Amino acid sequence: ALLAIADANKKAQTFKSVVNNVNFALESMARNLRTGSNYSSEAFLQTSSCSTGYKVGISFTSQEDESVSYFLFGTQIMRQVNGGTAVGITAPEVKITRLCLEILGTESGDNIQPNVLMIVGGLMEGKTKLQSRFDIQTLITQRIIDN
């Protein structure tokens, strides 16, 4: 019984670490999009894992005036700054199976604040073969007032 409790505790700690990684990666992405501007997804493919109009990546201008892109590569969300080397922002234990991004409100005079609908789905796998599926949807609105 003691070994079962220890094993359950180990699984819970591993799972918590993976969940924290997903939370950190997606919150960082959302924060950067919220404080950025000039959203575009023209350079990215349309994804078949979501409805029409969604893309697998997004580019924008950060508050530091850098060109930033987030996109799905294999099973990892990548971040690229100013055309440099793309870096994964999700841990290897997190397998992203879909990243769907839809940009709304970027047309001039549409009276809609630019925003991005983001849907992320995947699997979290711990070292103990504990696996859990997740789907997250969030709407990110640009802070800079649209003209």
Task: Indicate where each model-derived feature is located.
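Aliphatic-rich helix starts adjacent to a transmembrane/signal segment
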Residues: A1-A30
